[in-house]
Amino acid sequence: MLTYHYTLRSSAYRLLALFQVDLRISTLHFAGVLIMDNKKDNISEEEKLPKEKEIGGVKGLEPTRYGDWQHKGKVTDF
C-alpha cells in the first residue's frame, strides 16, 4: 500500500494514494473515475461455464489428425 501521498504530484495519484490504493492493480480513467482491475471480474461468462462433452462423437484419438475416418464400419480417407 502507498503511504507517501504527499510526494505524488498528480492530483489523481494523490487521490489514489490518499485512499491507499495499490497502483499496480488500479487504473485511472481519463475522466478521473477510478476503475479497479480485478482478474476475477475480468473472466468472461464463457470461461466460467464448464466445458461440454461431445455427444455422439468419436471415441479415442481424433481421426482428422491422422487423415482417416470410419463411417459405419467403412474407413474413408480424405
UniProtKB/Swiss-Prot annotation:
Superkingdom to which the source organism belongs: Bacteria
InterPro entries to which the protein is assigned, alphabetical: SDHF4
Signal peptide: none
The family this protein is said to belong to: Belongs to the SDHAF4 family.
Entry-linked PANTHER family: SUCCINATE DEHYDROGENASE ASSEMBLY FACTOR 4, MITOCHONDRIAL (PTHR28524:SF3)
Protein name per its UniProtKB record: UPF0369 protein RF_1112
Organism expressing this protein natively: Rickettsia felis (strain ATCC VR-1525 / URRWXCal2) (Rickettsia azadi)
